[in-house]
Amino acid sequence: MKEIIVKNSKIRLVQGDITELSLDAIVNAANSQLILGGGVAGAIRRKGGPIIQEECIKIGGTFVGGAVITTGGDLKAKHVIHAVGPRMGEGNEDQKLRNATLNSLKLLDEHKLKSIAFPAISTGIFGYPIDRCSKVMIKAVKDYLSGDTQIGEVIFCLYTTSDYEVFDKELK
């Protein structure tokens, strides 16, 4: 496990299953319709129970680069922040991923929450390269934590060893 300090906040790397983390919020790599399908979203749907998808349906969707918050249902995390990352090839992907990351952190602050875990957004079926993902997301988090925030801890939770190693090289 690797950790760095930015101002008054910690950024940590963890390898494992994001749905097993006991935090204020975990981030779901969502689609713009907020339908919990496969990947991280599927794991959240299976372990969190139907209430999360029901809340997503009530919200109705959000834009690429946007984020919305729901309850954590039966998960260990209190909330799920559904961040919509870009699909590779749609254009302006780096900025959209940065926005999804920043909008997730803003929601955390707005709800006076202190801890959050991100997966590698858009690197699954959306086809975004893991090395670019690590650069964009880590820089966005560092930039946000350098400002005025109450966030105490940001975790990047990577499912595979290879993804963890890519983020490990980038986090310095």
Short names for language-model regions:
Residues 1-111:
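Glycine-/small-residue-enriched capping loops at alpha/beta junctions
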Residues 88-172:
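Phosphate/ribose-phosphate-bearing ligand recognition and processing surfaces
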